[in-house]
Amino acid sequence: MSSGAGSGTTKGGRGKPKATKSVSRSSKAGLQFPVGRIARFLKAGKYAERVGAGAPVYLSAVLEYLAAEVLELAGNAARDNKKTRIVPRHIQLAVRNDEELSKLLGSVTIANGGVLPNIHQTLLPSKVGKNKGDIGSASQEF
């Protein structure tokens, strides 16, 4: 008697076929973000009467890309501040220092994010020793 390895059934064709393991749509698309949950949100949100099969996959991919981009920049900001944990301040610095993300999230307030450090040029002390340095360097040429 055959073991049924090729036919997908048990006991030589008798009995119930073995159930195949279900594969999520996220893993089929190679994503970490939940495609099924986003599909459920799209259907429940009444954005349209019907939702295509590819729409939640595409939206999941876009959201995953944006999250990865923000997390990479925030991780760099945390490393620059010699920290190992990303806090809202690092996310704020990452978003506001990136031109495209700042434009995308321009009207968004990040809680506990603080503000960007910025001192106006007129408030900074002026360089007085600039002219003396030029004279000194000219005298050194002789």
From Swiss-Prot:
PTM remark: Phosphorylated to form H2AXS139ph (gamma-H2AX) in response to DNA double strand breaks (DSBs) generated by exogenous genotoxic agents and by stalled replication forks, and may also occur during meiotic recombination events. Phosphorylation can extend up to several thousand nucleosomes from the actual site of the DSB and may mark the surrounding chromatin for recruitment of proteins required for DNA damage signaling and repair. Widespread phosphorylation may also serve to amplify the damage signal or aid repair of persistent lesions.
Q: Which SUPFAM superfamilies match?
A: Histone-fold
Q: Name one Pfam family in it.
A: Histone
State one molecular function term (GO): DNA binding
Asked whether the keyword Phosphoprotein is assigned, the reply is yes
Which Gene3D superfamilies has this protein been placed in? Histone, subunit A (1.10.20.10)
Known tissue expression: Expressed in meristems and dividing cells.
Q: Where in the cell is it found?
A: Nucleus; Chromosome
Region annotation Disordered: where it falls in the sequence: 1-28
Major location category of this protein: nucleus
Q: Which PROSITE patterns match?
A: HISTONE_H2A (PS00046)
Comp. bias regions, Gly residues: 1-12
Annotated SMART domains: H2A (SM00414)
Q: List the disulfide bonds.
A: none
Q: Phosphoserine modification sites?
A: 139
Question: Which key words are in the record?
Answer: Chromosome, DNA-binding, Nucleosome core, Nucleus, Phosphoprotein
This protein's GO cellular component annotations are: nucleolus; nucleosome; nucleus
User: In terms of domain of life, where is this protein from?
Assistant: Eukaryota
Q: PANTHER family annotated for this entry?
A: HISTONE H2A
Its domain description in UniProt is:
The [ST]-Q motif constitutes a recognition sequence for kinases from the PI3/PI4-kinase family.
- Quaternary structure and partners: The nucleosome is a histone octamer containing two molecules each of H2A, H2B, H3 and H4 assembled in one H3-H4 heterotetramer and two H2A-H2B heterodimers. The octamer wraps approximately 147 bp of DNA. Interacts with numerous proteins required for DNA damage signaling and repair when phosphorylated on Ser-139.
Purpose: Variant histone H2A which replaces conventional H2A in a subset of nucleosomes. Nucleosomes wrap and compact DNA into chromatin, limiting DNA accessibility to the cellular machineries which require DNA as a template. Histones thereby play a central role in transcription regulation, DNA repair, DNA replication and chromosomal stability. DNA accessibility is regulated via a complex set of post-translational modifications of histones, also called histone code, and nucleosome remodeling.
Which protein family is named in the record?
A: Belongs to the histone H2A family.
Q: What is this protein called?
A: Probable histone H2AXb
Query: Can you name the source organism?
Result: Arabidopsis thaliana (Mouse-ear cress)
